[in-house]
Swiss-Prot record:
It catalyses: carbamoyl phosphate + L-ornithine = L-citrulline + phosphate + H(+). This is Ornithine carbamoyltransferase. GO terms for molecular function: amino acid binding; ornithine carbamoyltransferase activity. Carbamoyl phosphate binds at S57, T58, R59, T60, R108, H135, P136, T137, Q138, C274, L275, R319. PANTHER family: ORNITHINE CARBAMOYLTRANSFERASE, ORNITHINE CARBAMOYLTRANSFERASE, MITOCHONDRIAL. GO terms for cellular component: cytoplasm. Reversibly catalyzes the transfer of the carbamoyl group from carbamoyl phosphate (CP) to the N(epsilon) atom of ornithine (ORN) to produce L-citrulline. Its EC number is 2.1.3.3. Belongs to the aspartate/ornithine carbamoyltransferase superfamily. OTCase family. L-ornithine binds at N168, D232, S236, M237. Pathway: Amino-acid degradation; L-arginine degradation via ADI pathway; carbamoyl phosphate from L-arginine: step 2/2.
Length: 333
């Protein structure tokens, strides 16, 4: 069966088939090889791309800008104070304005509905750079990195997310794993298990692809035989102190330590993280956490983060290659 991703938006991985997702991942591999060989393409030549960032970013912004420019596109960045979206101008109106000027739009913000509205009314491909509910571009990089390091087919890679089971990255990983027919464990406290809507959607997809979704409260049981141990920050910046205290109490037993990695009983297991990570006190936030809560490490220990099992910087680089693949697949000539 043939397919064409041109002019498709990239809002959530559940919108894609296994074959379509594999195509984007394989394209990312090809584009990465081409970049390493010194080849700069022109698949996006003459295209104008808008990057809407309601939330600041390092990896996502750089990945879109470098990826677009590598393939010949022009990029306009609209930061948190650089547009009227949702404040002085509705998302629907913004979509129609930008759709008349740009060939593609990246959106990184709060609401998944805003991303959907942009896609509905702009008339051009819209790419989800992160919302409170989902983070699909991150998952392509996570999967590509795991395949590169583990030398396994996607369907044979077993992922375990350890931490907040309602996290947007965990949601995206769960949906992506279901699409690819993978086994995916959410290792989380009872209070933070995935929402029924996301879990039901992932299970419905997995039933068709041969994937397996497991929710587990016990860390040792949840990580056994896993290939990839994944975590994310416990609390987003700007949340009140009470939330930090509550989350730390709930999630401290789910910190990824050397013992957690050993509990996989898999000597080849790797550690992934979407970054930034609070693994030491080298940042102002890290220092504040230590002063206020007595923790020098949060979701992952520095020992694991800096270990040979950690592939977080290869994973970060792959954000650019996979995002470039999404743009080329949906917008390229």
């Amino acid at each position: 069966m043939s397919f064409n991703l041109r002019n498709r938006s990239f809002l959530t991985l559940s919108d894609f088939s296994t074959r379509e997702m594999e195509y984007m991942l394989n394209l990312a591999e090809d584009l990465k090889k081409a970049k390493y060989a010194g080849y700069e393409g022109n698949r996006l030549a003459g295209k104008n791309i808008a990057l809407i960032f309601e939330k600041d970013s390092t990896r996502t912004r750089c990945a879109f800008e470098v990826g677009a420019k590598d393939e010949g596109a022009h990029v306009t960045y609209l930061g948190p104070s650089g547009s009227h979206i949702g404040y002085k101008e509705s998302v629907k109106d913004t979509a129609r304005v930008l759709g008349g000027m740009f060939d593609g739009i990246e959106y990184r913000g709060f609401s998944q509905r805003s991303a959907e509205t942009l896609a509905e009314y702009s008339g051009v491909p819209v790419w989800n750079g992160l919302t409170d509910e989902d983070h699909p571009t991150q998952v392509l990089a996570d999967f590509l990195t795991a395949k590169e390091v583990l030398k396994k087919e996607y369907k044979d890679i077993k992922f375990a997310f350890v931490g907040d089971g309602q996290d947007n990255v965990s949601n995206a990983l769960m949906l992506g794993a279901a699409v690819m027919g993978m086994e995916y464990h959410v290792v989380t406290p009872k209070e933070l298990e995935p929402t029924k809507d996301v879990l039901d959607k992932a299970n419905a997809i997995a039933a068709k692809t041969g994937g397996k979704i497991v929710v587990e409260n016990d860390v040792k049981a949840g990580v056994k035989n896993m290939d990839v141990i994944y975590t994310d920050v416990w609390v987003s910046m700007g949340e009140p102190d009470e939330m930090w205290q509550k989350r730390i109490k709930l999630l401290k037993p789910y910190q990824v330590t050397k013992e957690v990695m050993e509990a996989t009983e898999n000597p080849n297991a790797i550690f992934e993280h979407c970054l930034p990570a609070f693994h030491n006190t080298d940042t102002s936030i890290g220092k504040k956490i230590e002063e206020k809560y007595g923790l020098s490490e949060m979701e992952v220990t520095d020992e694991v983060f800096e270990s040979s099992q950690s592939v977080v910087f290869q994973e970060a680089e792959n954000r650019m290659h996979t995002i470039k693949a999404v743009m080329v697949a949906t917008l390229g000539d």
